[in-house]
Amino acid sequence: IGLFDQDDILHPSVLYAYVKEINEQGADYLYCDETTFKENDINKMLTMHFKPDYAPDNLRANNYICHFSVFSRKLLEGEELFRTAFDGAQDHDMILRLTDRAEKIVHVPRLMYYWRSHEGSTAASIDAKPYAIEAAKGAVADHLKKHGFKHFQITSTRACATIFRIRYQILGDPKISIVIANKDHVEDLKRCITSIQKNSTWSNYE
């Protein structure tokens, strides 16, 4: 199953690239890099989104996968595709749920999805759908609860309202290793250590 918007454009060879990964690696969830463009000219690019490979912590904080998602139908068994509770961020919710179930997630590192930017589209600005931010936080919170996390906080970062900072509850009393890059600057090192000893609220460090 592949999901894309009706007014966007796919690279002519994207299906070939995906089928190749399915045949060679047994991929059951795939995505690629993407670009936004304006008007009807894909050469008028506004942004180019070169994505990392699958990283669950990153995905919780930021729906970097977005387009062009293709996945095995078996991942939907017993699942809803889009949940109305997270309207505006239903793609983030869906991606979190399906990647949880996937056995082989493959990132095709090529610009193969062209996302049309127009008024009223989140490709142009998240301001077009301000409710999407709270919906995305709700989707991430639901995902974290399913993974057993409790007492966490999800806030938007200053960089972008849709990129979140997740503060997790610290479990136990883990030792923190403090590494100070210092060579031949004894006074600077002394000042750093004194500051740590004076101001730190955490006692278990080395």
Residue ranges and their predicted role:
Residues 141-198:
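N-proximal low-complexity "stem/linker" segments adjacent to membrane-targeting elements
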Residues 14, 18, 30, 90-101, ...:
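Structural preference for long, well-ordered alpha-helical segments in enzyme cores
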Residues 204-206:
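Short beta-strand/loop segment that forms part of the nucleotide-sugar
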Residues 7, 17-21, 43-53, 121-132:
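Short secondary-structure boundary/capping segments
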Residues 9, 13-45:
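Conserved donor NDP-sugar-binding/catalytic core segment of glycosyltransferases
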Residues 31, 35-66, 110:
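Acidic/His-rich active-site region of diverse nucleotide-sugar glycosyltransferases
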Residues 55-141:
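Conserved nucleotide-sugar donor-binding catalytic segment
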Residues 1-9:
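Short beta-strand-to-loop acidic/aromatic patch adjacent to the donor-nucleotide binding site
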